[in-house]
């Protein structure tokens, strides 16, 4: 009988696979877009009530907003933050605790 940790890991991997497939499909119609998962599911400490936190990154604000809307319409994320690529790159270098945590835990879902 598998351990609880093994079952949780298996369920997490299955969920990540579905998110990766969905993100790839959405990004296919949003060129140069990126989708990153952060939060409890990315860290692995999620539970049945955890939401799915995503970053929608694109070259400009209008494209980032459109990507975020598409992710929400596809029911891939509960909270989706739209960022320009320039802002994302700037935030990667910040020492703000919120963004430092995201930088450490984020998982890219779409194929690079």
Describe the residue ranges of each PLM region.
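Catalytic core of pol beta-like nucleotidyltransferases
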Residues: 1-34, 43-49, 58-112
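Glycine-rich beta-strand-to-loop/alpha-helix junction loops that act as flexible
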Residues: 38-40
């Amino acid at each position: 009988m598998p351990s609880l940790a093994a079952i949780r890991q298996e369920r997490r991997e299955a969920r990540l696979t579905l998110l990766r497939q969905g993100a790839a499909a959405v990004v296919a119609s949003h060129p140069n877009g990126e989708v990153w998962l952060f939060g409890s599911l990315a860290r692995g400490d999620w539970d049945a009530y955890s939401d799915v936190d995503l970053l929608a990154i694109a070259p400009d604000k209008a494209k980032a907003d459109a990507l975020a809307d598409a992710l929400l319409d596809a029911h891939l994320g509960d909270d989706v933050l739209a960022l320009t690529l320039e802002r994302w790159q700037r935030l990667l270098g910040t020492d703000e605790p919120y963004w430092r945590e995201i930088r450490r835990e984020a998982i890219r879902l779409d194929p690079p």
